Amino acid sequence: MSAPNQNTLWARTFVSELAASGVDTVCISPGSRSTPLTVAFDRHDSIETFSHLDERSAAYFALGRARRTGSVTPVVCTSGTAAANYHPAVIEASQARVPLLVLTADRPPELHDSGANQTVDQTKLYGDAVRWFHDIGEPEPTARKLRSLRTTAARSIMTATDTPAGPVHLNFPFRKPLEPTPVPGDIPDDLSEESITGRDGAFVESTTGNRVLDENSVNRIAQSLSTSRGLIVVGPMTIPGVDPEAVAAFAHASGFPVLADPLSGIRYGGLTRTTPIIGGYDGYLTSELWDQWPDPDVVLRFGASPTSKPLRQYLESTSPTQYLVDPAGEWREATFTATDIVVADPTQLLWQLSRALNTPGSSTWRQRWIEADKAHTDVLANTDSSAHQSLAATNSDSSTDDIIENTDEEGSNESDRWFCEGRILSDVMTAAPDPATIFVSNSMPVRDLDRFGSPTTQNRTVLGNRGASGIDGIISTALGAGSALATTEHLIAITGDLAYYHDMNGLAALERCDVTATIVLINNDGGGIFHKLPIESYDPPFTTQFVTPHGLDFEPTEDIYDLSFARVRGTDRDGFHTAFTEATTTTGSHVIEVVTDSESSHRVREQLHDRVIKRILDN
């Protein structure tokens, strides 16, 4: 591997070692100072490159690909504020445990604190949001330094994929010439072949294992779980997550129902055929109900904190014994009600506990949850569209209560029935092709999916940025996930209007990175989620400072980014079905804008919640 100068040798050596360690994709933000790295990645036969015009979008795209694959995705940029634009995605990767490798180019040391252009302090730029920061130092073509460089490459991959996974930041100072320009005498003639080419395979091979509890610890926990009323709660998890078969085995051995977050990897798929997967709890877990139910004795929890606030409040209020299982031993339970933390691999622990349990729990307890979830599903399925249609009508004199009361209890067979934004989420989950990767935005979409996205046997990989839960970078993250899909799997992104506005430039990746997507844009003209908060009662400033209606017309994105754009009203369910079916059965990328009213949707959510509670209590 001859090189024209030491910058080129340095970058080639590093990139070749990443490839030997399994890296097959990189996202590149164009820039001058990062030229050695960019050229090395671009010329490596085993690495696919994605070029991005915007640094923030590039980082989120890399995040999305790493989230979908579970493998490290590097992202490269030049010096200065380019690196700062990676910060939001780095924070998300850290909190969501996604393996990301950030490679920032830098100016030589003497240019720092000198007023030199495009020069900022990039040392530990991302603070404690990274698992490891290392300044590579200037290129030095010696055997020892090249071994160190290869070792650093291997270590960066090991650290990013360790437990917990997360981002790693490596900083590369380069002097000119940055291009692969021949520089006589730049590479010593006596440099050994191994120093230049490395070893066969990775320079440092990594072998890792899972944390497995000893038999006494397993038996102690199993004894506590040998009770009539228990729950399995699976919060958001990052791929590979927990093995569904292990969850099923423990659910059958214990008799416990499984409360599965939509981002858990458990709510959807074949597991639902044989295992009591509960998905509607966000729609009925209130004190009115749990005061009528016996409290759970014990809860076995996996993953991050559940999306559902009612579920978190239920666990806090009933105060059961709570085992928080985390392979990294980190605390991810913000109500501080967990009684035990178990540092173990979730899948291995479930298999161990399944073998150790002697008696299953109460079938009456399990059936209570199954029937409550069925009541929730039935109410949603049998609610007529007239509720939402009337609420959305201009200058309507009818109250929400009147409209709900006048709705036929058994519903309607009309295809054009609609009641709130949540129905969009449930219809997408039902009508999406099989298989599909579905990326859901923060704010209301993920909450509506939690409440309205009933468990299904269809193959759905549901992703979202629930680490730091920002609404920035949603489109870019979704398209990054889509870049990793086989041609037979569809990508569907569901986003609100503010998140869409935040990341419209991310749509450039559709063409630049050859990604195809169906994007469902729920446009309620502002921050509809604030209707769920007490500030709604204070107007002003509620409308101008929180809801922030914008009146933006998103249709021009059709021409800017060469995609198909359709607009339907939230009361036109048949129209949405037609547009969604066309989008998912024809070539190219599509945006389906569904125009809704956030306030009326919120009121209907409340009334549907009341109806579900009534149905459960009456039974």
From Swiss-Prot:
Cofactor: Mg(2+); Mn(2+); thiamine diphosphate
InterPro entries, per database record: DHS-like_NAD/FAD-binding_dom, MenaQ_synth_MenD, MenD_middle, THDP-binding, Thiamin_PyroP_enz_TPP-bd_dom, TPP_enzyme_TPP-bd
Broad enzyme group: transferase
Enzyme Commission designation: 2.2.1.9
Annotated transmembrane regions: none
Co-factor binding details: Binds 1 thiamine pyrophosphate per subunit.
Gene Ontology MF annotations: 2-succinyl-5-enolpyruvyl-6-hydroxy-3-cyclohexene-1-carboxylic-acid synthase activity; magnesium ion binding; manganese ion binding; thiamine pyrophosphate binding
A Pfam family matched in the record: TPP_enzyme_M_2
Pathway membership: Quinol/quinone metabolism; 1,4-dihydroxy-2-naphthoate biosynthesis; 1,4-dihydroxy-2-naphthoate from chorismate: step 2/7; Quinol/quinone metabolism; menaquinone biosynthesis
Keyword annotations from UniProtKB, A to Z: Magnesium, Manganese, Menaquinone biosynthesis, Metal-binding, Thiamine pyrophosphate, Transferase
Alphabetized CDD domains for the sequence: TPP_PYR_MenD, TPP_SHCHC_synthase
Keyword Acetylation: no
Region (Disordered) location: 385-415
Catalytic activity: isochorismate + 2-oxoglutarate + H(+) = 5-enolpyruvoyl-6-hydroxy-2-succinyl-cyclohex-3-ene-1-carboxylate + CO2
GO biological process entries: menaquinone biosynthetic process; organic acid metabolic process; sulfur compound biosynthetic process
Compositionally biased intervals (Acidic residues): 399-413
Magnesium in keyword set: yes
Bias-annotated ranges (Polar residues): 385-398
Protein function: Catalyzes the thiamine diphosphate-dependent decarboxylation of 2-oxoglutarate and the subsequent addition of the resulting succinic semialdehyde-thiamine pyrophosphate anion to isochorismate to yield 2-succinyl-5-enolpyruvyl-6-hydroxy-3-cyclohexene-1-carboxylate (SEPHCHC).
Quaternary assembly: Homodimer.
PANTHER family: 2-SUCCINYL-5-ENOLPYRUVYL-6-HYDROXY-3-CYCLOHEXENE-1-CARBOXYLATE SYNTHASE (PTHR42916), PROTEIN PHYLLO, CHLOROPLASTIC (PTHR42916:SF1)
Protein family (similarity comment): Belongs to the TPP enzyme family. MenD subfamily.
UniProt-recorded name of the protein: 2-succinyl-5-enolpyruvyl-6-hydroxy-3-cyclohexene-1-carboxylate synthase
Gene, per the UniProt record: menD
